[in-house]
Amino acid sequence: MKFVDEVRIFVKAGDGGNGAVSFRREKYIERGGPNGGDGGNGGSVVFVADPQLTTLLDYRYQQHHRARNGEHGMGSDCNGRAAEDMVLKVPVGTLVKDANTGELLVDLSEAGQRWVAAKGGRGGLGNMNFATSTRQTPRFAQDGTKGEELTLRLELKLLADVGLLGFPNAGKSTFISRVSRARPKVADYPFTTLVPNLGMVQYKDGLSFVMADIPGIIEGASEGVGLGHQFLRHVERCKVLIHLIDMGAEGEGRAPLHDFDVLNAELGKYSPELASKPQVVAANKLDLPDAQARLEGFTEALRERGIRVYPVSCATGEGMQPLMDSVAEVLFTGRTEKLHVEIPAKAARAGKAKTKAAEKKALARNAGAAAATKSATKKSAAAKKAVTKKAPARKAGAVAKTSAARKAGTAAAKKAPARKSGTAPVKKAAAKKAPARKSGTAPAKKSAVKKASARKSGSSGKAAAKKASAATKRAPARKSGGGRS
């Protein structure tokens, strides 16, 4: 049977039936009252966890599931028949999620668990329900409601107690076939197992548990290399993980310690919670040549980390019982003492030194980060202050420039009179020199003028004296002449 662990389906509940509009019509009854019946309820879609199923293969090819509708109401007070619910059986451990939002709706992790995914519609009321003392002949009825519909994504997480992890061709299928009745395909090539396999392990004293074998995980599985790590969800419910290491992988260019570190790194990328689960490390294929030599180096490397290694051979069954005893102790009691060993003194000292160095580096990084944050905050504060002070500084600079310009203007104004005053004495001196020059030539002219005036005054004085004497002589004559008359 093909293993399918993820499907997308559409479910729709049935609609409710409509109420009937009917009246009583019988002989000798003239006005019969309303007798329309109610509609039936629609069927719901219900999921049930079935322990007999191990795959979602049935839903891969049938993706639409619709419940039946309720029947309509009829006359003579007859109600419609309600539809039966549609029951969808899924394997135990199925997760039902909303395909649009990815929200987890329910985890069907228990056998027989039921969950109503889509509720059916309610049937409508007939007109007989609307008759009153004032409305004795209602000619209407109520319609049924619609059923719910959803698009769901079903994901299967196998319910196993112990999970088998390892690189491809590490011997996981051989291991589960050795300890249980599971018969997976076993071949000498990688990726023989393409789907998870479950096996029931019968332990001592009637104790039993389920073991899950999943396809191999390789480096880069978180990025889609190989089959990816989509199958890791099948071991998320496991309480214990068995980490199977191939001691014969060096011929393929791999080292056991490298495989161990790579697989744990891929687990951490997928889910830190899964990586923190208890791991039982088993070194497989000890029946191969040179496997014992590789086992010593691998065991010593993990001993320095405090991890115990169980050497086994799945082909011959060597070392299987001590391994299964440790697995059962961790599973049923929760004790993990057998999974660890005492770290050697040198390794412990080296580990302490490494931890101290790592702590110092971490402290230095934290201090550097704190200093960087402080400097960044200081720079940001200084930048903010500079931004706030730039505008006033610019204003002050402008004011200073304007005041300086004004002062320069006043100084220039003051310098202009000074320049004028500086040129004025020159002009005054020139003016003084000009009169001086004029005065130097003026005495000669004045003397000449004085001489001419003296000459004129001398002649004019004589003439004036003559005129005055003549006038005096004439005046008495005029007076006397006037007196005679």
Curated annotation (Swiss-Prot):
Question: In which residues is GTP bound?
Answer: 166-173, 191-195, 213-216, 284-287, 313-315
Q: Which residues cross the membrane?
A: none
Q: Give the Low complexity compositional bias ranges.
A: 367-385, 394-428, 437-446, 455-474
Q: Which InterPro entries match?
A: G_OBG (IPR031167), GTP-bd (IPR006073), GTP-bd_Obg/CgtA (IPR014100), GTP1-OBG_CS (IPR006074), GTP1_OBG_dom (IPR006169), GTP1_OBG_dom_sf (IPR036726), OBG_GTPase (IPR045086), P-loop_NTPase (IPR027417)
Give the Pfam families listed for this entry: GTP1_OBG, MMR_HSR1
Which residues lie within the region annotated Disordered? Answer: 367-485
Q: Which SUPFAM superfamilies match?
A: Obg GTP-binding protein N-terminal domain, P-loop containing nucleoside triphosphate hydrolases
Per UniProt, subcellular location reads as: Cytoplasm
Q: Which residues bind Mg(2+)?
A: 173, 193
**What protein family does this chain belong to?**
Belongs to the TRAFAC class OBG-HflX-like GTPase superfamily. OBG GTPase family.
| Primary role | An essential GTPase which binds GTP, GDP and possibly (p)ppGpp with moderate affinity, with high nucleotide exchange rates and a fairly low GTP hydrolysis rate. Plays a role in control of the cell cycle, stress response, ribosome biogenesis and in those bacteria that undergo differentiation, in morphogenesis control.
Its subunit composition reads: Monomer.
The protein here is known as: GTPase Obg
Which organism is this protein's natural source? Myxococcus xanthus (strain DK1622)
